């Protein structure tokens, strides 16, 4: 019987690293283990880059930390492997498993598991591809306390001409992240949609939009002297000028998550936001 292959990534804090050490010790005899280099150095093991785990046939990756750890891991893969998130004290919506449940959960996965695929967003700035977004793409003013003027175009039609601090363009998965904090709707991740949430708009009539998931959304700055920042999943930043067009559409490959929780999405929302 071929052993299952499990990858590990983690925050580099002591508590997270020690949990990974315990999990590896527990499953080392029944699974082939791969550990990302930074974590491997702390554990005194040989490391394998996350992007290399794709080519080695890893079945799933265990991510110990929060949503940020998961998002950074997904960014490093062209065709993301399934990820199991173990929650280290955050209110993340991508981390399903508490540390005390980690061993039992992984035990169940050794005999098989289901994968939940989530749409990502392709992000193109001035015809150059940025990292695909799992949660959201944010266009935000580069100058604090200075609004930007921009057009929002969907499938060639002008949706809005906004004056605002920016706009958040989120997947259904990302609707419970930054977009929700800015007043956007909570969208069931099974819904194929793109959510657009203006940030502190000047017009009171500016409200969030929900458009079909196969839409092509374009953003264009109106004033030549203004610059804006394009932020993907809160970490990757690029600068946009009025000469550029930011184009957002459905990515070719989804993010993938191991189904580990019996609770449905609505139960998760109630528990996380209580």
Residue spans for each PLM region:
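Short glycine/serine/threonine-rich phosphate/pyrophosphate-binding segments
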Residues: 16-19, 68-73, 176-181
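ATP/nucleoside-binding phosphotransfer catalytic cores, i.e., glycine-rich phosphate-binding loops
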Residues: 131, 139, 144, 154-158, ...
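Catalytic core of DAGKc-family lipid kinases
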Residues: 91-165
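N-terminal glycine-rich "phosphate-gripper" loop used for MgATP/nucleotide binding
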Residues: 59, 63-67, 74-77
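ATP/NTP phosphate-donor binding region
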Residues: 1-60, 99-115, 124-131
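Gly/Ser/Thr-rich active-site loops/lids in small-molecule metabolic enzymes
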Residues: 161-164, 169-205
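Redox-cofactor binding/interface segments in oxidoreductases and associated redox assembly factors
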Residues: 8, 63, 71, 169
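Gly/Ser-rich helix-loop-strand patches that form or flank binding pockets
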Residues: 76-77, 81-86
